[in-house]
């Protein structure tokens, strides 16, 4: 049975930047919220598209040939295989929609990389 999820409240509960939390699933995809600030890392997802929706603040998604600026309410889909680096100058809350197989930082592993198991845990 599905439950109502307040995305704003879910994002506010997060304490760590760049540590997504799964708030729902749709078929073979997860719906995640994250609190972000600063730069994540350049990476790509070879087999999966990744949807970013800004809930609060502003997010820049750097691509190799351009940068995409998103404000509250804007969304952007990074196509599979496209190298990108999300950046937030100030704290920003985002919703991510991605396949369950999508690795957090794609083809690279850094200190901020979170496993799916970590993303499924309730925020502390």
How should each PLM-predicted stretch be described?
Residues 28-30, 37-39, 56-60, 67, ...:
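Short, charged/polar surface micro-motifs in flexible loops or helix N-caps
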Residues 27, 55-56, 71-72, 90:
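A cytosolic small-molecule/anion-sensing beta-strand core signal
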Residues 3-11, 24, 89-124:
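Double-stranded beta-helix
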Residues 64-80:
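Short acidic-glycine-tyrosine-enriched beta hairpin
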Residues 43, 61-62, 78, 83-89, ...:
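Short beta-strand His + acidic residue motifs that chelate non-heme Fe in jelly-roll/DSBH
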Residues 63-64, 72, 88, 106:
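Short glycine-/acidic-enriched loop or helix-start segments at secondary-structure transitions
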